């Protein structure tokens, strides 16, 4: 979807100013919000793409006024409400008011290290050969889906060169909507700065983007 989360290359956004010696968390509640989001994915039954969409699917004014982990917390609340694991009055009261709903799976403290070590591999067996090869010119499709996508707006409609073929991976657009993994070939595509930003762009700039096959067409 197009939204405030996709800010790369927009002319009105200020440069990112990294915080010197930035800590991983600025407050204890941020640490807890991060941990709860990871832990609740198991009983909640959502995947990483659903979680991303829950965070980004909000009005720009709401998204931009929230801090990073406030967005995470808002996304978590939405997922919990959608699955009936909490009620709106519990969110408002910030405490449990009703009997807990039964869940099929939980993540215990003893299982955290193994889960993080295992990770979440996304590569899958391919059902057909890759459509593109390294060195081939491709154009990023000018798409504007209303749901989750990993194709940045600033490359849409522009031509690049396939740098690498990365294998067949879970397709985020389908996975985020609950329509299955629908694995698709994934490519690293290199775009020249002048192609993205015009003649005023840095002539030495190149941007590489990982793009799934449905995002691309032959140039």
Feature locations, PLM:
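N-terminal intrinsically disordered, low-complexity, charge/repeat-rich segments that act as generic
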Residues: 1-102
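Basic/polar N-terminal segments that are highly enriched at the extreme N-terminus
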Residues: 1, 104, 108, 217-219
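Short, basic/aromatic beta-hairpin or loop at an interaction surface
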Residues: 103-119
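Basic/aromatic-rich interaction segments and small domains that mediate binding to polyanionic partners
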Residues: 12-37, 79, 119-134, 142-219
